[in-house]
Amino acid sequence: MQVASLRYEVIFKKAFCDVEVFKAFVKDFLGIDLKIDKVETEKKYEKPIGNVDSRFDLHAEDLENRVIVDIQHRRYPDHYDRFLHYHCAALLQQVENAKNYSPNLTVFTIVVSTSGTKEDVAMAEINFDPIDCFTKKALNKIHHRILYISPKHVNENTPEPYRQWLELIKDSLDEEIDETIYHKHEILKVVDLIKRDGLTPQDRARMKDEYSEAELREKEKAEDFKKGQEKGRQEGRDEGIEIGIEKGIEKGIEKGKLEIAKNLLAQGLPVELIEQTTGISRQLFLTD
């Protein structure tokens, strides 16, 4: 079946902002049965924390379970640090004064990278709960967590229920999916939501925009790399010239000292005194 790739932000949001899909995904990855009736996209807070206006691709608040779940999709060079910052921003937004630093809601962030690098793994976690340094036992005091998942790294060792979700996302990247290998209702719903023939004109337009933006970023990276190479070569040439000049000066000074030593020798000065005065070894000025 032909589908739109989940690497596109617009397609990922189209599929995972569906409440049923979002809840099933969170249940399988976090073990939480969310009580929600909507999923927000491009969520941001009225008063940003610090100098960054953090935005959350997909955001849901469950007041009954007292949790916030954010799902982030886009890949950045500062991938791990960026989404740690966003996660902490969601925590800090809840602290109103110095009387109580405990957030009302536990924050969970799931970061999905469809362009994983060789340094990534299928699933990695930052767990904020303190651990006893000696027994390694968790204190069960802080429950905030961040999951970084990379579908490109799914393999036969990836356990369920994670594996089927990761395989679905990975399979979509070449825009072809064999839906017969999937059996979970919510996963089949994702397949249905991203069918090529079900895309709206707005979906297609945004996909083209994202493709153009990605091309531009790659072009800028290539240009920056080229500029860096040229700068490195120029600095190498400049350094070589500078070293050459320094060596030339050193050689000239040594040659001048040698001439002085020879002149002093011709005037009858003792060899030891000439060595002390010029710093030139007698083997050099006694050769002639």
Each model region followed by its residue ranges:
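Short, charged alpha-helical interaction segments and adjacent helix-coil junctions
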Residues: 2-6, 63-72, 166-288
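Conserved single-residue anchors adjacent to enzymatic active/cofactor-binding motifs
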Residues: 1-204
